[in-house]
C-alpha cells in the first residue's frame, strides 16, 4: 500500500510539473538577441518521451498489475483500484520528460551564467580604460543550437547532449588623438581558459609617436644674455651707492659722543651649578668675560653694531676704522692752510676811528625836546 501511494504521488507531481512546463514553454526565451521558441522545447520533450526504455516500463507495469489485484482483494478505496495502466504509462513518461527538461533547463542556466561571466569580465576590462578615452563596444552573443547527438550506452538507452557556441563581435574603438599607449582585447581560443578576454599591449603602435625635431629642441633652449649684461653693468652703481650711504652713516656716527665707561652687566644667576675654583678654569673664565665686555663696547662704537652678530660687527668695525683714518689724514692736510689764513688775519690793521661818520648814531628828526624847568 505504501509503495502504491508513493507511485501515485509521483504521478500526480509529474502531471503538475508537465502542466507548468507547458505554460512556461508558451513564452519566448530571449538572450543576446536570439529567441528560443517553444517549438524546439516541445520537440525535445516529445523526443525524450520516445527515448524511454521499454523493458523498464514493462517491468513497472507488471508490478502495478500485482498491486492492483491486492488492492481489489482488500477493498481499500475505489480511487486506487480505478487506475488505468495506460494512464500510469503516460504519467511515467511525463515524469521522465520533466526530469529530462529539468536537466536541460539546468544546462541552459549554466550556459547563461557562463555568458554572464564573460560579459562581466569584459565590463571590468573596459571600465579600467574609461577614464581618458571613450570606448564604444558592440558585443552580441549568439546561441546556436547544434544538431542533437545521440550517445548509445551499454544498456541500450540513449542520452542527449547539446552544445552552444558564443561568438563575440569585433571590438570597435573611437580614437581621437594618439596618446602613445594602445591596448587590445582578444577572446581566448582555448576552451580550457575561463573568463572573458585578454589584455594585450601593443608596443609597435606606441612607437608611432613623432619624435621632436632638433630645430624645436634648439629653439626652446636658446637663452638671451642681454638682460644679464645689463645687470652686470648696474652692479657698479649699486656698489657706489652703498659706499656713499655708508660714508654718510660713518660721518654721522663720528660726531656722536662716545662713552668708554664699562657698563655693569648683571651676571645671570645659575641654580644648582657648582663653580670650579681651579686656577686654570678661573683664568679662562675671566679672559672670556673681558673679551665679551670689549665686544660690547665695540658694538656701541660701530654704527649699527648692536643689531649684528659678532662676525659681521667685526667686519663693520674694520671698515669704520678705515673711514676714521681717512678723515684724520684729510684733517692733517687741511691744517697748514688754516695756519696761513690765521696769519693773514693777524697782520691786517685792526684800529678804526671811534667817531667815524659811519658809526655815528642816527638821530630821529621827530624827537621832541622838552624845555628844562
UniProtKB/Swiss-Prot annotation:
Which compartments is it annotated to reside in? Answer: Nucleus
Q: In which tissues is it expressed?
A: Flowers.
Per its UniProt entry, which superkingdom is the organism in?
Eukaryota
Q: Where is the composition biased (Basic and acidic residues)?
A: 188-218
The answer to whether the entry has keyword Transport is no
Record region (Disordered)? 127-227
Q: Which residues form the bHLH domain?
A: 275-324
Presence of keyword Transcription: yes
Q: Which GO terms describe its molecular function?
A: DNA-binding transcription factor activity; protein dimerization activity; transcription cis-regulatory region binding
Give GO cellular component annotations, separated by semicolons. nucleus
Keywords of this entry: DNA-binding, Nucleus, Transcription, Transcription regulation
SUPFAM superfamilies from the xrefs? HLH, helix-loop-helix DNA-binding domain
State the PROSITE patterns in the record.
BHLH
A biological process term (GO) from this entry = regulation of DNA-templated transcription
Q: How does it assemble?
A: Homodimer.
- What is this protein's record name? Transcription factor bHLH87
Name its species.
Arabidopsis thaliana
